[in-house]
């Protein structure tokens, strides 16, 4: 029975990821005053299926000098971790209701760094290695602010359980009292998922395509799926933290619709940002984090800790 539950979570995620690629190409197309894919199937709806078939039927080439085991393990690990992070998400009921769901997701996103590092190192190519090192430095750096922002939000929530965030936001979305945090959180999620304008790892002019430059066919598709699954997952996380969807136990369908619409809006915003902004320079990226975001988030975290104490009460504990 548990296996059926897992499969019923994984298959919709993979389908969502497949069609997100189509949405991205369509949105970018219309933003550049062109149509986007519209040949394969009605309105190009079968394009993701054609892409998947094309990728998985190609020969998985491997460089002679690469480390075989690690080279194959890296994309598998990336996809596994990307799918594992969906387990504690309440939609409205999680697959596994964890007490420390937020901590679990933070730990999983930190582990994803290893798959990038392994892929860059195992490829035995200098482009891949430079791309991987950039990606790792960027991901680790932005995780610092993500963790501090999470801590500040959870002080208002009172526990590390994701389900309590829904109850906390029944009357007021947390984006209103914590809008500076929400702003920094959103920019940090862009950097965390290696999206434009922070897609330094894929600097085409200097690194071809970053850490996955030596990958082809199936393993490349796995990295691709992992990246897009992480994008949707981060947007779901943002929705849970700041745009709490109202949950009526008698009508869970309403929650699902509410939740999906907010997640979709954030995902379209990701694509809109990609179409609008040029890529950052590497030093600007690091400067933004260590000199701007980190002091601000630390100050706001202290503010969130001291405010309840000043007003003669302790933070909520559930």
Curated annotation (Swiss-Prot):
GO molecular function, one term: NADH dehydrogenase (ubiquinone) activity
UniProt enzyme class: translocase
EC identifiers of the protein: 7.1.1.2
HAMAP family registered for this protein in UniProt: NDH1_NuoH
Function: Core subunit of the mitochondrial membrane respiratory chain NADH dehydrogenase (Complex I) which catalyzes electron transfer from NADH through the respiratory chain, using ubiquinone as an electron acceptor. Essential for the catalytic activity and assembly of complex I.
Complex formation: Core subunit of respiratory chain NADH dehydrogenase (Complex I) which is composed of 45 different subunits.
Protein name per the record: NADH-ubiquinone oxidoreductase chain 1
